Amino acid sequence: MHIKFKWLSFGSLSLVYATMIMGVYLSSIHKSLSCPDWPLCPNGLFRLPEQGYIIEYIHRIFVILAASMIYITAIFAYLKLKNMQRLTILASVLVTIQILIGALVVTTKLELMFVSIHLPVGVALFGITLLTFLFFLRKTSTSTMYK
């Protein structure tokens, strides 16, 4: 059907998962505020970060990549796959909310309310990207199964 959508949705899922793993790792080593500025770390986007916040820097790069992939997937679904629009639009809304919550986590210096919301929204985003990928696979496998 649309092999591009398969790879876009899988790419979104993979990038969201990798971003979550990095975020959990940062939390577990107590380095969530190793890069205290938002949206960029003190060295900016294109200069190599200092050793103290390289994981946080990579986490933010992955956020940019994941969000971009999710938005591109939603645009593709809007233009080509009407039956996938709702899930991809929901993923786009969730990733936008997640970015805003992440900004609040950093700018409020780990305010408990925002930290407490950040992970569940990420889990919901992961779930929606997983459902998008699985529903598309199911639809394509059942549509080709009976031909």
Where are the model-predicted features located?
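Polytopic transmembrane helical bundles with strong interfacial aromatic enrichment
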Residues: 1-147
